[in-house]
């Protein structure tokens, strides 16, 4: 049985920063393996739902090594894609990806974004919110820096609703993924934390309500990956 590695709330931010610093160099490889390569299509769908204008400004929160940043830059050939993260080694690992792109990394915290009000036309975030200490505060910050009419698209973990799929999902992420991490020389604690954090993350309906209470309008979501993930969207109304 896996040992619980989830940190107490007052230690979570420091724990997460240290963990992602440790796994930065192999994160992309392990992430692709862990999601069976489906994460690429999910990111593309998320950016399409955010649909930033071609000459606009888009922000990716918890950008990590910049996979979303690349998608956003390609969507906006005359715009600017900004990725913010508080784990510097992750962004350093992603620098080769954004070479030649209209994209930049910025150090910052999702709960205190280093940007002025109404700075961005679209905001994306992927597999980030389960790592923050206050999901509602993160959505309020997104709302603050979004322009009126701006969009948010959030890709996050979910759990399949069909019982057999849910059981298979549990076995894969709670048992198989940590073993794969060990076999591939990845950090076993990190790849125990990731599925455990997903297990306690709010379900899609609850996350949608958190978004509404943070100020977002027209909130909806779609399930992807047989219900293993969800893409939530919203609009900032005047």
From Swiss-Prot:
What pathway does the annotation place this protein in? Quinol/quinone metabolism; menaquinone biosynthesis; menaquinol from 1,4-dihydroxy-2-naphthoate: step 2/2
What Enzyme Commission number(s) does the record list for this chain?
A: 2.1.1.163
Give the reaction(s) catalysed: a 2-demethylmenaquinol + S-adenosyl-L-methionine = a menaquinol + S-adenosyl-L-homocysteine + H(+)
Record family assignment:
Belongs to the class I-like SAM-binding methyltransferase superfamily. MenG/UbiE family.
> Its Gene Ontology molecular function terms?
demethylmenaquinone methyltransferase activity
User: Highest taxon of the source?
Assistant: Bacteria
Name the residues that bind S-adenosyl-L-methionine.
Answer: 65, 85, 109-110
Gene that this sequence comes from:
menG
Q: From which organism does this entry originate? A: Roseiflexus castenholzii (strain DSM 13941 / HLO8)
Q: What protein does this entry describe?
A: Demethylmenaquinone methyltransferase
């Amino acid at each position: 049985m896996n040992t619980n590695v989830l940190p107490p709330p007052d230690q979570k931010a420091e724990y997460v920063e240290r963990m992602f610093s440790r796994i930065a160099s192999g994160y992309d490889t392990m992430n692709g393996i862990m999601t069976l390569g489906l994460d690429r299509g999910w990111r593309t769908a998320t950016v399409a739902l955010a649909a930033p204008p071609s000459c606009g400004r888009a922000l990716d929160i918890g950008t990590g090594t910049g996979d979303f940043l690349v998608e956003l830059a390609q969507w906006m050939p005359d715009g600017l894609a900004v990725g913010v993260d508080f784990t510097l080694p992750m962004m350093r690992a992603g620098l080769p990806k954004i070479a030649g792109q209209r994209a930049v990394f910025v150090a910052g915290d999702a709960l205190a974004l280093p940007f002025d009000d109404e700075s961005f036309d679209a905001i994306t975030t992927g597999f980030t919110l389960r790592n923050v200490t206050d999901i509602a505060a993160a959505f309020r910050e997104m709302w603050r820096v979004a322009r009126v009419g701006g969009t948010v698209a959030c890709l996050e973990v979910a759990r399949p609703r069909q019982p057999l799929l849910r059981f298979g999902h549990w076995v894969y992420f709670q048992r198989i993924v940590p073993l794969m991490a060990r076999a591939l020389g990845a950090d076993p604690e990190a790849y125990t934390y990731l599925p455990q954090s997903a297990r306690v993350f709010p379900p899609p309906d609850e996350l949608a309500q958190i978004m509404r209470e943070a100020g977002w309008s027209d909130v909806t979501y779609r399930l992807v990956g047989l219900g293993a993930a969800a893409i939530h969207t919203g609009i900032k109304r005047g």
